[in-house]
Amino acid sequence: MLEPNKGIQINEVEGEIYLVEFGDGRDKKRFLEMCPWTYEKYLILLRELEGKQVPKEISLWQSPFWMQIHNLPLKSQTRETGRAIGAKLGEVMDVNVAEFGVHWGKSLRVRVKIDIHKKLVRGKKIVIEGGEQRWIAFKYERLPNFFL
């Protein structure tokens, strides 16, 4: 759980929309990086505001999730591959690979901002080197009840 350096203030704006104010910008950055947040396994949607929005115009329809891409050949577990596959599902925020650019493991982790109104994609057929088709499976981390 987040333990802020200089406190957090939460105020209801309208209906189920709340404004969270941080006393320290580093706390806010860390809070947003740790998304998704849940309460009793229900998703809490967060969005950084500019301050110009009217409460009724605030759209909350995306949330970041870490997904694992399974069944990729080892040499394909790169930042570029993660970005290309992740971009088909949403906005890619991060690909978890070493600094030298390749991940040697059973899956490649990609952080993707997903539209919560769409069904989750469980996998996809891709063409790998040599023209072979392969099914790659997607597993999502820390899914809330909303998606189950």
Feature map (PLM): residue ranges:
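Glycine- and charge-enriched interaction patches
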Residues: 1-148
